[in-house]
């Protein structure tokens, strides 16, 4: 709760804005000096309205920077995971201060996500074509299939915005049914009942008689891991396992990427875009994942988040620092913010340098310097 107190010092009235926050099991009271009074009731209410957001923001920062990760199972160094978590939280709490920008940025992420996810599967529509279909229902493309591959996401987004549950078989079938509408109505929302092979790989997907059991086992695995595993690693592992099962005749890639994003968004991460230009790296990471090595895929996905989805953090960092200086936040917050943005830039440089050599994406390179 944010409240105003006044102190009397040598006959003069001084006003302070206070807010209590719990950190590491202890209560810390934040106090911002408002000025020398007396103030009228109207002035007090105006100050409370004007300044409350910033003291609440300070409390959020203190929570972020005091948080200790307690993931029991992780593949990447905790120091690396900590930066992802910090960027996620900073991205989240910055949104109300730049509402219009964030809304447009999220719309752009959704558009590029749809274009990338369908292009990976062979859709030839341009980004502009996809935009016309999603935003204006304007027909575009060489075939009806290509148009519906894009248009179906509009219905899917509407459903997912209202969905409050977690991953289950019903949700997976609903996602597939929606994405395959008017494309393959006979098999939309139905698990495959035939065995298949995947061209270009040595991997054999799950035999059809045990697909439902394998999907249910995957869901149970997810439920057992979701509180103990970093969200990015959890999302990548779920995606990999789902692709290996390959439960549908067609549409497995699109469903797997939607489920990956569902896990990220449910954990307050922004949407992830895998652009068509990264298709080769993405598919190679999945191939490596088939051998049991998930690290290249996790580093690849982390790199996309840092490079693209967390772009608002870099865009508004200086503005945020200016607000903090103006409000006389503690030097600890300013220092931690500087450390975080420097780590962000350092990780981005490391990952960009590694991606061109996908076969060598490994922890020994990621652990350069402090990433241990």
Region annotations inferred by a language model:
Residues 1-250, 254-372:
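FIC/Doc superfamily catalytic core
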């Amino acid at each position: 709760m944010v409240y105003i107190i006044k102190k009397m010092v040598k006959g003069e009235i001084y006003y302070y804005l206070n807010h209590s926050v719990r950190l590491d099991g202890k209560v810390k009271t934040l106090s911002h000096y408002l000025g020398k009074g007396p103030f009228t009731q109207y002035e007090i209410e105006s100050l409370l309205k004007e300044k409350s957001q910033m003291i609440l923001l300070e409390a959020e920062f203190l929570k972020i920077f005091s948080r200790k990760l307690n993931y029991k199972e992780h593949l990447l160094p905790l120091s690396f995971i900590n930066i992802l978590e910090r960027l996620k939280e900073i991205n989240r709490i910055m949104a109300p201060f730049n509402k219009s920008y964030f809304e447009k940025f999220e719309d752009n992420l959704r558009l590029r996500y749809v274009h990338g996810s369908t292009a990976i599967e062979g859709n030839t529509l341009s980004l502009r074509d996809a935009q016309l279909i999603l935003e204006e229902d304007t027909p575009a493309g060489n075939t009806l299939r290509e148009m519906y591959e894009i248009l179906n996401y509009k219905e899917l987004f509407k459903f997912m915005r209202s969905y409050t549950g977690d991953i289950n078989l019903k949700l997976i079938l609903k996602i597939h049914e929606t994405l395959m509408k008017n494309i393959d109505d006979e098999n939309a929302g139905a698990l495959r009942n035939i065995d298949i092979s995947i061209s270009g790989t040595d991997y054999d997907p799950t035999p059809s008689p045990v697909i439902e059991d394998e999907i249910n086992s995957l869901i149970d695995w997810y439920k057992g891991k979701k509180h103990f595993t970093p969200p990015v690693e959890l999302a990548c592992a779920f995606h990999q396992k789902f692709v290996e099962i390959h439960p549908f005749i067609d549409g497995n890639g699109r469903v797997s990427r939607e489920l990956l994003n569902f896990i990220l968004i449910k954990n307050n991460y922004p949407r992830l875009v895998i652009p068509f230009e990264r298709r080769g790296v993405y598919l190679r990471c999945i191939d490596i994942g088939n051998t049991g090595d998930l690290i290249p895929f996790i580093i690849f996905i982390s790199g996309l988040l840092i490079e693209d989805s967390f772009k608002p953090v870099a865009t508004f960092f200086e503005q945020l620092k200016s607000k903090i200086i103006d409000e006389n936040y503690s030097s600890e917050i300013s220092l931690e913010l500087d450390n975080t943005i420097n780590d962000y830039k350092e990780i981005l440089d490391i990952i960009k340098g590694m991606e061109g050599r996908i076969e060598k994406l490994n922890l020994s390179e990621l652990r350069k310097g402090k990433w241990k």
